[in-house]
């Protein structure tokens, strides 16, 4: 059946004849000079043909430059997120379809046969074949120097390592002894495991292929310690920071100044429309790096053509005013897919043993949650338009339970104080601050990424109500990367961030992210490290309910009954709501999306979510175009 669905997706595409392929004007000179082959030779034998009419979209005109902003140099990786070329991808209804793949076959949810598109090429024109998967498998993840930890955890099911075979140039087979039903959704993620590599490019940095003396010279010039470090530095399809690394994304990194990155259309991209016009429609993406605090102002000033990253609900008023004052843009309001707009994460792996014991007591976490005036925060920061409550599945998810949203989430200072008293935290300083068991004042430090004014404003309100509990809140803004590293190391007492990326789960969604399987869940970084490294780092979970979450996640992977999976999901969500590992404050506040008035095929409504959906990715940014692209050129 899964094979049939994949093939039907292919057959439903509109007919296309190779001789109708239209050459893009952007690469016309290179084609005329012989530096590039003509369009018919650059496309796969069977390209992915987009049916614009079926999607309710219009055919576009090639050309123009899309301007967007990011706040950090490393955010060039957003081009891989937005571009969203994946082996399989999510459609807007969250069904999976073959994208880079021509099709796929699934047998018993444990054997996956991936069929590549004959004639598909990397951005430098080299064939994309099963050899690129072989290189990843044999020469990267199974090379002890490049990957000391061995194959990634998704290749193991029930402790058994899967196999990867390569029957021919256009077929790759992944197989496990038992079902691995999360394999395809994993490939469709915003930040997927890239299970292929441009072997023809990377071999020059690999000891098994490169000439020893020339490789040693490359290592010296790159100022790294080993050939493996050099290989890893050159090889990152997600970071997108090596312009020489071939890609399959719609745009390729053309470098540029450090503060202004340029990306130009991939001449070998595999998607076309029914007229034979190669996507993406837009020729160039100009990504400018600015201070996070300037993004809204620059959007208001008309310096972007497409922007949502770096914009928050409080920016809507200034954006709408600029629009009404004659700005050449529209401000769309999309839904937000994160499980919580703002969530506080007490670190259960904090290295201070006294504080760690306090935070591991569920009464403390419940008291913190009941000491938050969510209604005041909603009215003050979101004009009452957000949903007040804890972190759980959003209202549009079939797994949403209103009881989980409200669990321990109603302001009740009296009850919160009673819980803290029950813990024995009855001693007070002259200023009324409770004392820890060792006599220290209860000063609760929450570290932030310092990027969102709404977070700091919310914490200012929380400070006042927590003071009534005898808890002094101290806010510490940090750089995002420093914050993450402190949390992972166990030196951060608590952090504030969004809720789960995926607030829209279905029973078919893997619930692993609700269990201690990843250090990126700030409540249990050490437990996540333990799972991710198979016990070589971090700490094993040593609390009852987190262990139960691990068991439930494992149970989910061993059943394929939707009803049973739903039962598992609901128990896991109930545990989170009851235990308050992450203390959600608000959710579902509208996400502003600034769009040039000249841009077409942009959805009026959508969901802004990293996972699933890759932000703009699921909405196919390669199909966006300008009404008059000649007016949209880079300066």
For each of these PLM feature ranges, what is it?
Residues 29-33, 37-108:
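N-terminal lobe/hinge region of extracytoplasmic solute-binding protein
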Residues 63-72, 102, 111-115, 136, ...:
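Short, well-ordered beta-strand elements
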Residues 117, 238-242, 268-320, 366, ...:
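Ligand-site clamp/hinge motif
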Residues 140, 145-150, 164-165, 252-268, ...:
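Extracellular/periplasmic solute-recognition and catalytic clefts
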Residues 153-230:
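Surface-exposed binding/hinge segments that line
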Residues 245, 251, 255-261, 265, ...:
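Detector for C-terminal structural segments
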């Amino acid at each position: 059946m899964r094979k049939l669905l994949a093939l039907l997706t292919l057959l439903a595409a509109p007919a296309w004849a190779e001789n109708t392929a239209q050459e893009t004007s952007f690469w016309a000179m290179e084609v005329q000079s012989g530096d590039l082959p003509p369009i018919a030779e650059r496309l796969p034998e069977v390209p992915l043909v987009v049916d614009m009419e079926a999607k309710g979209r219009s055919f576009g005109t090639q050309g123009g430059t899309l301007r967007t902003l990011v706040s950090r140099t490393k955010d060039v990786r957003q081009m891989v997120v937005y571009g969203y070329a994946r082996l399989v991808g999510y459609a807007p209804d969250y069904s999976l379809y073959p994208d880079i793949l021509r099709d796929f076959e699934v047998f018993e949810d444990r054997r996956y046969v991936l069929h590549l598109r004959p004639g598909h090429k990397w951005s430098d024109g080299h064939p994309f074949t099963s050899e690129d998967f072989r290189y990843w498998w044999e020469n990267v993840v199974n090379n002890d120097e490049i990957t000391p930890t061995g194959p990634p955890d998704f290749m193991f099911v029930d402790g058994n390592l899967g196999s990867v075979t390569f029957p021919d140039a256009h077929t790759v087979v992944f197989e496990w002894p038992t079902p691995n039903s999360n394999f395809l959704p994993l490939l469709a993620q915003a930040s997927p495991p890239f299970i292929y590599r441009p072997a023809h490019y990377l071999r020059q940095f690999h000891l098994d292929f490169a000439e020893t003396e020339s490789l040693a010279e490359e290592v010296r010039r790159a100022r790294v310690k080993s050939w493996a470090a050099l290989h890893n530095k050159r090889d990152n399809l997600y970071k997108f920071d090596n312009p020489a690394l071939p890609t399959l994304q719609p745009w390729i990194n053309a470098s540029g100044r450090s503060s202004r990155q340029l990306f130009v259309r991939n001449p070998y991209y595999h998607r076309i429309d029914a007229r034979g016009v190669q996507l993406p429609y837009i020729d160039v993406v100009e990504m400018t790096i600015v201070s996070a605090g300037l993004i809204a102002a620059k959007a208001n000033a008309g310096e972007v053509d497409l922007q949502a990253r770096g914009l928050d609900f409080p920016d809507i008023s200034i954006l709408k005013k600029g629009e009404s004052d004659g700005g050449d843009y529209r401000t769309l309001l999309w839904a937000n897919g994160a499980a919580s707009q703002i969530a506080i994460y007490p670190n259960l792996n904090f290295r201070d043993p006294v504080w760690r014991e306090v935070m591991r007591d569920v009464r403390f976490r419940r008291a913190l949650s009941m000491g938050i005036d969510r209604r005041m925060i909603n009215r003050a920061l979101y004009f009452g338009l957000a949903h007040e409550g804890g972190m759980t599945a959003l209202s549009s998810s079939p797994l949403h339970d209103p009881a989980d949203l409200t669990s321990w989430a109603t302001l009740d200072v009296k009850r919160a104080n009673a819980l803290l008293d029950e813990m024995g935290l009855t001693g007070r300083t002259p200023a009324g601050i409770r004392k820890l068991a060792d006599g220290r004042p209860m000063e609760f430090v929450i570290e932030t990424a310092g990027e969102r004014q709404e977070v700091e404003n919310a914490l200012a309100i929380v400070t006042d109500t927590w003071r009534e509990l005898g808890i002094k809140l101290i806010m510490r803004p940090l750089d995002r990367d420093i914050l993450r590293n402190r949390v992972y190391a166990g030196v951060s007492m608590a952090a504030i961030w969004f809720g789960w990326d995926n607030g829209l789960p279905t029973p078919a969604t893997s619930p692993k992210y609700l269990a201690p399987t990843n250090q990126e869940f700030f409540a249990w970084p050490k437990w996540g490290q333990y799972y991710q490294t198979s016990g070589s780092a971090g700490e094993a979970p040593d609390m009852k309910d987190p262990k139960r979450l691990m068991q439930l996640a494992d149970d989910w992977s061993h059943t394929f009954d939707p009803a049973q999976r739903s039962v598992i999901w609901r128990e896991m969500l109930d545990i989170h709501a009851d235990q308050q590992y992450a203390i959600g404050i608000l959710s579902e506040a509208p996400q502003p999306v600034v769009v040039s008035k000249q841009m077409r095929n942009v959805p009026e409504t959508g969901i802004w979510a990293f996972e699933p959906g890759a932000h703009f990715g699921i909405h196919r940014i390669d199909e966006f175009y300008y009404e008059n692209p000649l007016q949209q050129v880079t300066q």
